[in-house]
Amino acid sequence: MSDNEKTTQPASTDSTEPAYRYNAALAQDIEGKWQKIWDDKGTFWAANVNGDLKDGKGRNADGRPAYFAMDMFPYPSGKGLHVGHPLGYLASDVVSRYHRMKGENVLHAMGYDAFGLPAEQYAVQTGQHPRVTTLANIANMSRQLHRMGLSFDDRRSFATIDPGYVRWTQWIFSRIYDSWYDEDAVNPSGSKGSARPVSELVAKFESGEKAIPGHESDGKAWADLDQAEQQDILNDFRLAYISKSPVNWCPGLGTVLANEEVTAEGKSERGNFPVFQRELRQWSMRITKYGHRLIEDLDGIDWPEKVKLMQRNWIGESHGASVHFTVDTADGSKDMEIYTTRPDTLFGTTFAVVSPEHHLLENVPAEWPADVPEDWKGGYATPVEAVKAYRLAAEAKTAKDRVDEGGEKTGLFTGLYATNPITGAKLPLFTADYVLMDYGTGAIMAVPGGDQRDYDFAVKFALPVIYTVKPLPESGDDLANYEGKAPFVSHDGIVINSSVEATAAKGDALSLNGLRVDDAIAKVNAWLESAGVGKGTVSYRLRDWLFSRQRYWGEPFPIVYGEDGTPHLLPDSALPINLPDVPDYEPRTFDPMDAESNPEAPLSRNEDWVKVELDLGDGKKTYYRDTNTMPNWAGSCWYYMRYLDPTDTKHMVEKDEFDYWMGPDHNKTAGKSGGVDLYIGGVEHAVLHLLYSRFWHKVLFDLGYVDSMEPFHKLFNQGMIQAYAYTDDRGQYVPAAEVVEGPADANGEPTFTWNGQHANREFGKMGKSLKNIITPDDMYENYGADTFRLYEMGMGPLAESRPWNTRNVVGSMRFLQRLWRNVIDETTGEVRVTDGELDTKTLKLLNNTIADVTVEMEAMRPNTAIAKLIVLNNHLTSLDAVPRAAVEPLILMLSPIAPHICEELWSKLGHTESLAHADWPKADERYVGQDSVTAVVQIKGKVRAKLEVSPDIDPKELEKMALEAVADRLGGKEPRKVIVKAPKIVSIVPAE
């Protein structure tokens, strides 16, 4: 029998067992009873400051300390939950119950992330409308979670597909769309840079305070521009804007994807389909404007360092310079801006490269310039033909293929030349697909003497190589080791070959020779700014967030377009914009390799919905709805705030409620950042949901809608529950529950068979495709929810992955049975505790357990808390009579982990109120600490003596006592080595 098969084996069902034994059947009765009581009495209702959301006793918050704990809410998939899913939910529930017992007003609720691709794909599989299947899945998942005994305030539950929720998601989009980022404005935290209403930008254009882009020289006023021209200019500033740029097009899914949804292999994260670069018109969000703040504010929140590092690396802040080169095109002189982290190497620039999508390629010459090498032309008769063909070839490649370091470097000459602003050199301008338009400016200056990729390209096309940095003298290295062989790649060294008598831009002399790299960068940046051809600047690896999808199952945009294509934001009174109920909601997908295919949004097929007659203030006109939908990340960007009051129809979140639950310093641990007190979820969301939520929150913070800088003050990443899976000799997965474990083989390893045939065991994830799923429903039926909770919380540290092994579940059941027997006579059902005084040993153990378990609960270490509670319970079992004064604190301490049995025992002990709000036990400090500990003395790893010593004994004193205790075994010789780990271990290595 395999480990997984044992999942279905219940606790004892022996009809001869005592009538009141705690078993699966009794556990189910107790759990059903208490879940109904909790529901009926509103035991876990959190009290708001104002309004109808009061606690179970009809009270508002009334100044009680607030604590807000939540989980990353689930996708309501058709598969339901397996036992790995609730790990985080159970952890947050334990924490929430503990904080209630500390007297805090705890907000703990659960909603459902119901839009997006998973729900749509499941609906496609079942042939039903996404709303029908999603609501059914929510009902099933809600049932499973409720049966687990999670202490949610169910009044606050919602799904992101609820019209009342969609309304506020669209409202937030509207605020972002109607905002721009003012670099000079001071945000509420006191630093520079803030989102401001677009109306303020318009006022700056109208007053002349800010120059109108594209009209600096023609003298046109803002009022002289027509509506379309004004909207085009504002579009370049809005935080939510329409862009026509290279995007990640996935034919296999029929939609575009954000960079974060594309794997390092250039495939879609969902479905593993190829992803291609296509220039399409899409919605984007200007998250890059918040790059520095998103990095800087990580210092003020309590997140795992690995997640902070992942966000810092993903944002990728780098300091360098923007430099303007002049390019003579068929349409006159054009500016080409590049970004470089090494402006000191401008003297070593021997060519330039632009992305195939770069706008300069619209103006290549009709004929090749004289004396162009044939291999620069790519075999084409003219630059126009060459560029057109190269662009088509680049479109057919994935982003990964284009930047793959190991791939062949392709490229061709454009027929254009760029002028170096310092040296005046005419640099041949190439196009190459390894330069991406959405990174930097889509143009690079190539320095083959200091960059391997540029060097390889220069060698391929026989371009000059100029070295501008040599090794530091103290390095022992020499430039001769590189010249003609390889680039010298270093961020430190001495600058060489970098001087000119008269610069092209200013005509002055400039020399960087002899300077260290950092000093040279500072000097050249100052020169660039003084010459008006560049400046020191900051760039980010982070790209603006691609925000539209060609899907049906998502939030519609609150945007319509006029006959001229100008976008118009719908008024808040028109929200929500609901999806039409249509029969044809499936996206049109294509051959996964069809890079030339074009997105076809499902909503575009519904003309009655798309074409509308509206009066937007200037009379009734015909408009056309945007047929894209928002990505599944939209609803999850702000859902934590809706828990504060999902019934509020007037506000996204009311200010008093926000300040109470999430404001800066709203409790002792919230800190300046404010936000949710505890947020539990998987590390896989580090650069997706968590980054997007922080961005939206900061925009709302800047605009004054929320008062905290961050959405989540403390983040905890739970580990993964893993399980065995089994395959037959063909490599196909077989049902784990049908696998039989046989005798060990010659190497002592267990053997397995399925249907009489050999089976192979492997260890990894739990999943439907692996046929090794164990569901909570199995556990409820065969052990009860409390045993399941206790086992899962006791498996190991929460942050670590751990193996599921059903044979160990019975150990958790036995612990609860022993606790039950300590209180209840299994034969009569009577309470068997006594009211006598505690003996000294019990008194000390109890108070030390209270002190230790409190520390473990504060640190979110329920596994070690359980271990200490087992020790206390075992001690009580050994007594002739179990004292009430010891078992009641034990029940209280166990209740966050196994609440149903503890409620039942608490009730049987005569208490009339639920223990959910009982006071957490406090240790009597007079009995905390140990009078002595046992120190083990080892010689060559074997225990040779044990000493009772003070817990704070001096290591030298312990060494002396240990040597005296084993002196006869050392034969009077001085030991070769003594290792003291006071107060518990002394290891001795004797002399030879």
Outline where the language-model segments fall.
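Basic, alpha-helical terminal appendages of large translation-related enzymes
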Residues: 1-62, 373, 464-475, 483-486, ...
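Amphipathic alpha-helical
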Residues: 35, 284-318, 359-412, 575-608, ...
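Helix-rich, typically C-terminal accessory recognition domains appended to large enzymatic cores
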Residues: 113, 184-191, 236, 241-248, ...
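N-terminal catalytic cores of NTP/NDP-binding nucleotidyl/phosphoryl-transfer enzymes
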Residues: 52-134, 158-169, 338-341, 420-457, ...
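Residue patterns forming the tRNA-binding/recognition surfaces of aminoacyl-tRNA synthetases
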Residues: 2-27, 32-33, 37-41, 126-336, ...
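Alpha-helical recognition segments enriched in aromatics with Gly/Pro capping
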Residues: 150, 416-439, 468, 603-798
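Conserved oxyanion/phosphate-binding beta-strand-loop segments in alpha/beta enzyme cores
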Residues: 2-10, 15-70, 100-109, 133-139, ...
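Catalytic alpha/beta core of large soluble enzyme barrels
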Residues: 92-93, 105, 362-471, 477, ...
